[in-house]
């Protein structure tokens, strides 16, 4: 039995805490809303972020991070990307022994364009890190909460660490594969949010299945192109954390990014969309970070660039579609060498 603290009590953190508790681990969960932590402890429910799901009574919730981290040997980080450094800076003052740091967040840090594992390694002293592991894949919290069949990937530089996390989570409804390509796994999970926003826009505009299929396919090309330039394995982007996550995020009403894009396509402003969502839409921040990365690394990402102009430069969504359709003619095979 592993003592593990889930840091972040949103929908995904809560669902993963449930998986770990189902597997018999000593599970604590921390959140910054005391009333929500009280509800988890007394009613065994997170009505704000995962309504209708009864949680295992063995999950203990804390609003004090210091109390939540007592004697743990593993932490699972599931907080918004913009909050990572603040949370990690608080945690490094509490943790005294080397532990395993797992993260299940899909985004790139705003401002630095760093992957989350890089942020962890920057903020946490080396003597407090046993391993850094990423858990990612096509996985809506709502379906995991219902214990519906889900498959994800555990990635780490040290394969033994990825396998240890695989053992922590794997059960009859939650299957875990391993992958040594931590760069590719993180980038696939983060960058697909951009394409999901764009897919929502195409649906909001009523452009049809042909346009959406093209968008997803060309979107995967962009993800692989930047991922390869940053050191990821091209095959990773054809797997669960690339194509798999892209499909589920672009086609499901559970997807916050798709829902946000759908509202944009129907004429709502970005401010209206974010206010109505009530939860973090990582794709918005990731679009900005990826656009900056693409320019810095001289990687062509036309869908990302078009979406960036819509989100941050006030470009009209219909004009963005026109700009993509009117691009210079290309050979498809020449455009996707990283996938061959």
Swiss-Prot record:
Sn-glycerol 3-phosphate binds at residues 106, 137, 139, 192, 245, 255-257. It comes from the Bacteria. The keyword Chaperone does not apply. It is an enzyme of class 1 (oxidoreductase). Signal peptide: none annotated. Its main location: cytoplasm. The active site is at residue 192. One of its GO terms (molecular function) is glycerol-3-phosphate dehydrogenase [NAD(P)+] activity. NADPH binds at residues 11-12, 33, 106, 141, 256, 280, 282. GO terms for cellular component: cytosol. Coiled coil: none annotated. Catalyzes the reduction of the glycolytic intermediate dihydroxyacetone phosphate (DHAP) to sn-glycerol 3-phosphate (G3P), the key precursor for phospholipid synthesis. This is Glycerol-3-phosphate dehydrogenase [NAD(P)+]. It comes from Bacillus cereus (strain ATCC 14579 / DSM 31 / CCUG 7414 / JCM 2152 / NBRC 15305 / NCIMB 9373 / NCTC 2599 / NRRL B-3711). The lineage of its organism: Bacteria, Bacillati, Bacillota, Bacilli, Bacillales. The gene is gpsA.
């Amino acid at each position: 039995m592993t003592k593990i603290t889930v840091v972040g009590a949103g929908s995904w953190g809560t669902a993963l805490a449930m998986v770990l508790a189902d597997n018999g681990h000593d599970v604590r969960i921390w959140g910054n809303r005391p009333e929500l932590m009280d509800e988890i402890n007394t009613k065994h429910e997170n009505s704000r972020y995962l309504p209708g799901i009864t949680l295992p009574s063995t999950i203990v919730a804390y609003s004090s991070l210091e109390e939540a981290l007592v004697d743990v040997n593993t932490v699972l980080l599931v907080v918004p990307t913009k909050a990572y450094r603040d949370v990690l800076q608080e945690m490094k003052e509490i943790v005294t022994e080397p532990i395993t740091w797992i993260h299940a967040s899909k985004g790139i840090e705003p401002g630095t364009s760093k992957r989350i594992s890089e942020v962890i390694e920057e903020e946490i002293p080396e003597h407090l890190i046993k391993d850094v592991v990423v858990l990612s894949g096509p996985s809506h919290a709502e379906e995991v909460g219902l214990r519906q069949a889900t498959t994800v990937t555990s990635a780490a530089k040290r394969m033994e660490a990825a396998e240890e996390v695989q053992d922590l989570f794997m059960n009859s409804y939650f299957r875990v594969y391993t992958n040594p390509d931590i760069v590719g796994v993180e980038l696939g999970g983060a960058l697909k949010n951009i394409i999901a926003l764009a897919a929502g826009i195409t649906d909001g505009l009523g452009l049809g299945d042909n346009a959406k299929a093209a968008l997803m396919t060309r979107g995967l090309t962009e993800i692989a192109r930047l991922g390869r330039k940053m050191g990821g394995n091209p095959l990773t982007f054809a797997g669960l954390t690339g194509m798999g996550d892209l499909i589920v995020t672009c086609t499901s009403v559970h997807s916050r990014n798709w829902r946000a894009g759908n509202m944009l396509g129907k004429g709502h402003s970005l401010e209206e969309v974010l206010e109505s969502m009530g939860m973090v839409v990582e794709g918005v921040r990731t679009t900005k970070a990826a656009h900056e990365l693409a320019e810095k690394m001289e990687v062509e990402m036309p869908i990302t660039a078009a979406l960036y102009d819509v989100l941050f430069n006030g470009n009209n969504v219909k004009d963005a579609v026109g700009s993509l359709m009117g691009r210079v003619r290309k050979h498809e095979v020449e455009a996707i060498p990283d996938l061959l």
